[in-house]
A protein has these predicted regions:
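Solenoid scaffold repeats with emphasis on beta-solenoid/beta-helix
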Residues: 2, 6-7, 12, 20, ...
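Surface-exposed loop/turn segments connecting beta-strands in extracellular beta-rich domains
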Residues: 4-7, 15-19, 27-30, 35-41, ...
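Short glycine/acidic-rich loop motifs that flank beta-strands on beta-rich extracellular proteins
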Residues: 18-23, 40-52, 74-80, 121, ...
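Short, recurring structural edge motifs at helix starts
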Residues: 52-55, 159-161, 183-185, 214-219, ...
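Surface beta-strand/loop "capping" patches
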Residues: 86-115
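Ser/Thr/Gly-rich low-complexity blocks that favor extended beta-strand/coil architectures
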Residues: 104-141
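Small/polar beta-strand repeat architecture
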Residues: 126-170, 174, 178-180, 185-187
Length: 351
């Protein structure tokens, strides 16, 4: 789905794809209603999709999943993100920059008249919006971009540019993310409004992963407003490593941007993430592994211990928090789980 608007897929079973099931790029308003990835056992298939079930890059408007069922994919159920392009040259007047798309062709991400954010590589912090006046293509991955305003002197070569015109609001509800997959549940990095509610997660890896990647995949989208509520998480994380690694995620919900805080005063990458009123059935300890979030809430959840699988996660604390601020963990019920414990890194006790 490329350069499209107002697209609906409804009541579709995807029984085999050699890659992703549904992929969207620079498209607006996409609805997936009762779209299911299903392993075709009659053809002796082992996977429904070789890669992600659903994947959306630099889309905007609303991406909605309603009543979808994801099983048997070779990678994640859903990934929604933008793209960082690296600044490789800046003109003397700072009104022209050269961009390099490290993992993704820059010409497919940026167009004339798009607004952009410059990003500090070392912190992930955004600068003021600017606008692309025109683009000269050097190759599919290299663009020379003329800006309306000079690039602020804070930014230089090896920093990044993110598209500020193309990012999505997201609604995911009444879906099932099943165990018969190799990787994680849903990956969400977008500054739009995100609501995840009334879903069932039985994922092999972490159920929800929120990143922001400036060192490998270069997937952008620092979160500003995310509400995860009234979901059922059931024995997620069975792909975790038993040899000290993190496997497919450190905890039930992992928030792990590339930026690593140096101390308690380091800037934060994500903001306003609320995890509330969920039911969590877990055979292992780690509930949250969170880095660089301001305004994190884990409130009014019910955590119930199961013994369906042996504990294998490398993280042995309930909550691992690094460089976070204004955190509230309260009013939760723990049934058979024992007392929750914490690992705090670069955290002020007042936070």
């Amino acid at each position: 789905v490329v350069n499209c608007r107002n697209v609906c897929f409804e009541k579709i079973d995807l029984r085999h794809s050699p890659g992703m099931g549904v992929y969207g790029l620079r498209s607006e308003n996409i609805l997936l209603k009762a779209v299911c990835t299903v392993v075709n056992r009659s053809e002796k298939r082992r996977f429904s999709c070789a890669a992600d079930a659903f994947h959306f890059t630099n889309c905007r408007g609303l991406i909605e999943l309603d009543g979808c069922n994801c099983n048997g994919q070779g990678d994640d159920a859903l990934n929604i993100h933008g793209i960082y392009a690296r600044i490789v040259a800046v003109s003397k007047d700072r009104k022209q920059i050269e961009l390099f798309g490290v993992r993704f062709p820059a010409e497919r991400v940026f167009k004339a008249d798009d607004e952009i954010w410059p990003i500090v590589r070392t912190t992930g912090s955004r600068g003021a919006r600017n606008r692309i006046e025109r683009i000269v293509r050097k190759s599919s991955k290299r663009l020379v971009v003329a800006l309306r305003e000079p690039l602020d002197k804070t930014f230089r070569e090896d920093d990044f540019i993110e598209n500020a015109s193309w990012y999505a609001n997201v609604s995911i509800h009444d879906c099932y993310f099943g165990r018969a997959n190799r990787a994680r549940g849903i990956l969400l990095t977008t500054p739009g409004k995100v609501v995840v509610h009334n879903n069932r997660f039985m994922t092999a890896g972490t159920a929800i992963l929120i990143e922001g990647d400036t060192d490998y995949w270069f997937e952008s989208g620092a979160v500003c407003d995310m509400d995860i509520h009234d979901n059922l998480f059931e024995n997620c994380g069975t792909s975790a490593s038993n040899n000290g690694g993190s496997g497919w995620g450190e905890a039930l919900i992992s928030i792990t941007p590339s930026f690593r805080p140096a101390d308690e005063s380091s800037p934060v990458y994500h903001r306003n993430i609320r995890i509330r009123n969920n039911r969590i059935l877990t055979y292992d300890r780690p509930l949250l592994h969170v880095r660089s979030v301001e305004g994190l809430q884990f409130v009014a959840n019910c955590v119930e211990q199961t013994y369906d699988f042996p504990a294998t996660a490398a993280q042995r604390q309930s909550f691992c928090l690094e460089g976070c601020r204004n955190v509230r963990i309260a009013e939760n019920r723990f049934i058979g789980y024992g007392k929750p414990d914490f690992e705090l890194i670069h955290m002020n006790p007042n936070n």
